[in-house]
UniProtKB/Swiss-Prot annotation:
The gene is rpsP. It comes from the Bacteria. Keywords: Ribonucleoprotein, Ribosomal protein. This is Small ribosomal subunit protein bS16. It comes from Cupriavidus taiwanensis (strain DSM 17343 / BCRC 17206 / CCUG 44338 / CIP 107171 / LMG 19424 / R1). GO terms for biological process: translation. One of its GO terms (cellular component) is cytoplasm. Belongs to the bacterial ribosomal protein bS16 family. The keyword Ribosomal protein applies. GO terms for molecular function: structural constituent of ribosome.
Length: 83
């Protein structure tokens, strides 16, 4: 099953997350199918903290990919900020 979830990057104490479409059996930071965005929880004022490719997100959901709870929250937050 394909899931859309966060893959952690960055360095110690400075997290950065890629939002990726991956097989559910893959490790958290392992192989993924496609990167559909990023989330930077420590973004400074004026920096972009969240970017999502809405078209690719819609495609993956259309073919049956499940969102992780955190990604679902971020998608909702991103839609609210865009409106």
């Amino acid at each position: 099953m394909v899931v859309i979830r966060l893959a952690r990057g960055g360095s110690k104490k400075r997290p950065f997350f890629n939002i990726v479409a991956t097989d559910s059996r893959s490790r958290r930071d392992g192989r993924f199918i496609e990167r559909v965005g990023f989330y930077n929880p420590l973004a400074a004022e004026g920096e972009e903290g969240l970017r999502l490719a809405q078209d690719r997100l819609a495609y993956w959901q259309g073919v049956g990919a499940q969102l992780s709870p955190t990604v679902a929250r971020l998608v909702k937050q991103g839609a609210k900020a865009a409106a």
